[in-house]
């Protein structure tokens, strides 16, 4: 028997789940648009969909913020219907051989900084900045970076007085240890500076391929956190950023000069990276590393299929759903997350010169290359809490361990 959510979304197959609830694909019964639906039992001990829905409503309209289509009670369950998005940056990082080029990192950094600035402008901290929580769009928005998973978000200004929350110490670690700021490790209340420091670690992770505090052995989570904290604090910025442009070290130095309640100069940080981008002679054409890989594969497949009709060995982005579990947010303050899960461009579509000398528009490249359309939409709070940090993967893609991911639908691109 077909199940209709909110009177207009026909529930499809399950694409993720865990202790927090389950994620399904769904299709609008009139427009046939495909969306993502997060469902949780309304009697769960720690319900969070209502909180997430309210927060998304607050952020609604911002570039790179998923839209809520419907929220309400369906029988005995709460349901949140949202945009379906593409693969996470962690998925794409793995797909590209666990390293991004400086050009790709800088193009991503510009959008990621803008997303964080927007969330801060609405009075909230994200508090779980990591590659898994940035997803690419689909279709015509395949170039746009989205920020998701606000399950640990917190107001840093009082809604009535607009005063900044007070400085506190002895706080539990909230977020993901690998990317947490030094002050977060030390138990200091998080502020805007901490989201930005976490972003810095994400960017270095992309450039380096790993961070010095990954893979540390420990007997329990506390010891693991302590070791990560010790290694992170004892690693000089210049060592962390060695062999990479000085702008990345400057980024960290700036973050460390910010006081607890100081408003960051987001424009300064974006100019820092934009000036580097220009100096290196890059073109902001939204052609990322994964775009090139998929294009090269499509060319190879095309030549092979011409030699052997019907043959194809193109691989899609591998998506491991065996680890796509979720976790219940115990509370904003008590939650300790120790896991790490592996654009709308304006102006004319950039061109890629093909081997035969003709040009292929960016949108056409995505179409011809079967650019992976992951079902990684994570309505807020779907990231995996309390999963071992070196093993979990990102998002809610559809796939298996042995085969590449294949899109079961056409990218909505609405």
From Swiss-Prot:
Catalytic reaction(s) noted: L-seryl-[protein] + ATP = O-phospho-L-seryl-[protein] + ADP + H(+); L-threonyl-[protein] + ATP = O-phospho-L-threonyl-[protein] + ADP + H(+)
Biased composition (Polar residues): 302-325, 346-356, 370-395, 403-414
Function text: Protein kinase involved in blue light responses (e.g. hypocotyl elongation and flowering) by phosphorylating CRY2 to reduce its stability.
Residue sites binding ATP per the record: 15-23, 38
An example Gene Ontology molecular-function term: ATP binding
Active-site feature positions: 128
Organism the protein comes from: Arabidopsis thaliana
Entry-linked PROSITE patterns: PROTEIN_KINASE_ATP, PROTEIN_KINASE_DOM, PROTEIN_KINASE_ST
Pfam families: Pkinase
GO biological-process terms attached to the record: blue light signaling pathway; photomorphogenesis; protein autophosphorylation; response to blue light
Biased composition (Basic and acidic residues): 330-341
Keyword Nucleus found: yes
Residue ranges of the region described as Disordered: 302-414
Protein name: Casein kinase 1-like protein 4
